[in-house]
């Protein structure tokens, strides 16, 4: 009986030793290297986001992606040696969502549809994007090393800001103005580094004054080498009589609930602004403020029923948190 017990203990010890060796072999087969990421926000934005997400995608699908949320200043990660494509973007945005994150080629930022506004037609529009800062690296090699690799990175804003003022007559008959822009990028391919237009108008709020309407809106940046955003539907682009056009749409909801619509082609001005370039300090050159020609005013027809004596309630057009970026008055031709 004693011999049986002794034999069992010897067998158990041998199994534990083999398990330990096997586990050590596995760890040796899958080593990791330390990566220390430092993020520089100087000249990017004064209003830092909450933090960033960093994703290492193995090249050619060899291995698993390494994914971690870091502070806005960066942090350390453990990454197996190999060749990777990398994306970095800020998280906890208000309107921006992420999809297609399973691969470097498909990860994309977008905004959802404008549901819940209670205004007919807005459910087909999408929200304007808030601030998004990204970095994409097509190939980065991580060597096997016990030394921590330091990576100094700087993200770039991929959301462009615009403003415009349009003179109009008959605004006393208007309760609300709904604005949208069609033809700008409403989503952004982070890995590919380009904006994409899916033919969904981008909604924005409009402020109604005595004789003009003003608004601020945002859109994802377009690819730098192109003057127009890439369309998702080739067939729609080929059959459209206004392919590539960027159209500003204003819907004047009058006091009798009827709607009068005005459309303005701003293609040439948008293209010029997208290619404004940078100054000697490396910052974007401020675009010129262009006054609206008097002959291009919009006139809202008088409704069949008298306006509300208390006055119509317009949608607020104030936007907080705008920095010294691209704010421009667009002309109407």
UniProtKB/Swiss-Prot annotation:
InterPro entries: DUF5119 (IPR033410)
Protein name: Putative fimbrium anchoring subunit Fim4B
Residues with lipid group (N-palmitoyl cysteine): 21
Basic and acidic residues composition bias: residue spans: 294-304
Spans annotated as Disordered: 274-333
Keyword flag Transcription regulation: no
Pfam entry (one): DUF5119
Family: Belongs to the bacteroidetes fimbrillin superfamily. FimB/Mfa2 family.
């Amino acid at each position: 009986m004693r011999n049986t017990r002794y034999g069992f203990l010897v067998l158990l010890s041998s199994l534990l030793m083999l398990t330990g060796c096997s586990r050590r072999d596995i760890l040796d087969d899958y080593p990791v290297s330390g990566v220390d990421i430092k993020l520089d926000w100087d000249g990017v934005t004064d209003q830092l986001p909450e933090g960033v997400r960093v994703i290492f995608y193995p090249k050619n699908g060899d291995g698993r992606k390494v994914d971690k949320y870091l502070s806005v200043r960066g942090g350390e990660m453990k990454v197996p040696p190999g060749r990777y494509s990398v994306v970095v973007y800020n998280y906890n945005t208000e309107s921006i969502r992420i999809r297609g994150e399973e691969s470097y080629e498909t990860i994309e930022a977008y905004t959802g549809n404008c549901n819940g506004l209670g205004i007919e037609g807005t459910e087909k529009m999408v929200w304007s994007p808030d601030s998004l800062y990204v970095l994409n690296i097509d190939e980065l090699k991580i060597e096997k090393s016990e030394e921590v690799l330091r990576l100094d990175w700087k993200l770039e804003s991929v959301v462009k800001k615009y403003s415009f003022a349009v003179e109009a007559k008959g605004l006393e008959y208007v309760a609300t103005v709904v604005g949208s822009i069609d033809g700008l990028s409403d989503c952004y391919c982070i890995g590919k580094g380009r904006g994409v237009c899916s033919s969904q108008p981008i909604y924005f709020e409009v402020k109604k004054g005595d004789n003009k309407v003003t608004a601020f809106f945002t859109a994802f940046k377009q690819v730098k080498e192109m003057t127009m955003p890439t369309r998702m539907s080739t067939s729609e682009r080929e059959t459209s009589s206004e392919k590539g056009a960027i159209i500003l749409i204003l819907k004047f909801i009058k006091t009798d609930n009827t709607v009068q619509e005005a459309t303005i082609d701003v293609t040439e001005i948008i293209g010029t602004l997208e290619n404004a370039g940078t100054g000697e300090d490396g910052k974007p050159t401020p675009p010129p403020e262009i006054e609206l020609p008097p002959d291009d005013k919009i006139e809202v027809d008088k409704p069949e029923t008298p306006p509300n004596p208390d006055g119509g309630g317009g949608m607020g057009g104030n936007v907080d948190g705008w920095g010294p970026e691209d704010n421009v008055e667009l002309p109407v031709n």
